[in-house]
Each structure stands twice: as C-alpha cells, then as structure tokens.
Amino acid sequence: MTDFKLGIVRLGRVAGKTKYTLIDEQDIPLVESYSFEARMEVDADGNGAKIFAYAFDKNRGRGSGRLLHELLWERHRGGVAPGFQVVHLNAVTVDNRLDNLQLVPWGWRPKAEETSSKQREQSLYWLAIQQLPTDPIEEQFPVLNVTRYYNANGDVVEEEENSCTYYECHYPPCTVIEKQLREFNICGRCQVARYCGSQCQQKDWPAHKKHCRERKRPFQHELEPER
C-alpha cells in the first residue's frame, strides 16, 4: 500500500465526545480560511441522528456555515444539481475524503448490509482516530466537557425533560450513535460517558480513567401529593 497523508481536523464536542473529521492532504490548507465544528442532525421521524462537519468562512462569520462534504464536492467535482445530494459511502459522516463521497439522487439508500465490527475496526477512519492522543482539553479542563442537548429540529437547547439527547459511543474511533434515546450503557462511575457495548468501553478505559470522576447524585425529595 502506497503511503499517503490525511488531515485530521478537530471539530469540538458533540453527542458526548470530541469529534474529528478526515480530509485529503490537498484540502488541509482549508484550515487557514475556514473554521470547523461538528453538528448533529436529528431525524424528525425519530430515526436517530447523524453528526456532520460544518465549515465556516473566517471572513464571513457564523452565517457562512455549510456542510463540509458539500463544500469539498463543489471544489473538486462541481456543483450539486437540484434533486441530488452528496453522501458518505462508508456511512462515516465525518470521513470527508473525496474517495468517500458520492453524488446520488435524493432518496437514495445504500445496500442494507450491516458493517461487521471487524470491518469497522479496519476502516481508515477508525485506524486514524485510534492513533490520536487523548484530547488535551478534556485532560486539562474537564469542567468544559459540557454536552450539548438537542431538540427534534437539531437546535441546541437547555437540559430539560423534553429535550432529545442522542449520544455517540464515547470510544473515539467508534461512530455508532444511539437510534433511541438512552439506548447506550453509561459509565457507572462518572455517569457521563456512554458506550455502544462493553467492548468499546473496555478499549476506552485506559484513556477515560484519567478523567473519570465518581458522580454523586443529589438526593431528590419526592413531592407529597396535594390534598
């Protein structure tokens, strides 16, 4: 296999973890003129959520935000015609290498083939993210690890009973995200990190234990019924 370079861009925290995006070497200079962040898009029909990378032109401000994969497609392949969309072939929605992008008609669905855990662990995204050190911001400023909460429209809301909070597996390379609210197992010690299964939780423990702090739940008084 010929050696090649990739860019790994930090997007910030969303869905309970720090997210990164992969880009081709030729697109690395974009970091000079764009800022990047992760955003969650919640399916209005209740079919879970997806996380995408957004790019913001530094000269135009926050109003210039757009999906990174669409920006890259237009730079290298041309405009997206009405009735078409750009999708990620491997279903990893932050793997924005050009080889992983494809233009398809709206309504297109990939083959219903379940990606085995073995295939997932051998994917380029998995291998790349697995090599990253622990996020220094998580290690030095754990108080800043605030999870964003989203409603059904994908808008950030305060923590409240009717908010829809989807989590992605806390193990950095894993991109499995909850299809239903509170679906994943939660770390019994900190009550924050969530995992798609015991295997990912075990793999994440060497890094997670450095800033996993036992959470003391406040005692809640039950309200007496009105008479």
UniProtKB/Swiss-Prot annotation:
* A UniProt-annotated Pfam family: zf-MYND
| Membrane topology qualifier | Peripheral membrane protein
Picking any one GO molecular function of the record gives:
zinc ion binding
Q: Name one GO cellular component term.
A: plasma membrane
Q: Which residues are the signal sequence here?
A: none
Zinc finger (MYND-type) positions are 174-212
- Domain of life, per UniProt, equals Eukaryota
Where is this chain's protein located in or outside the cell? Cytoplasm; Cell membrane
Quick one: where is this thing mainly located?
A: cytoplasm
The entry's note on the tissues where this protein occurs is: Expressed in brain, testis, placenta, heart, liver, skeletal muscle, kidney and stomach.
According to its UniProt entry, the function of this protein is described as: May be involved as a regulatory molecule in GPR24/MCH-R1 signaling.
Q: How does it assemble?
A: Interacts with GPR24/MCH-R1.
Which protein is depicted? Zinc finger MYND domain-containing protein 19
Natural source organism: Homo sapiens
Q: Which gene encodes it?
A: ZMYND19
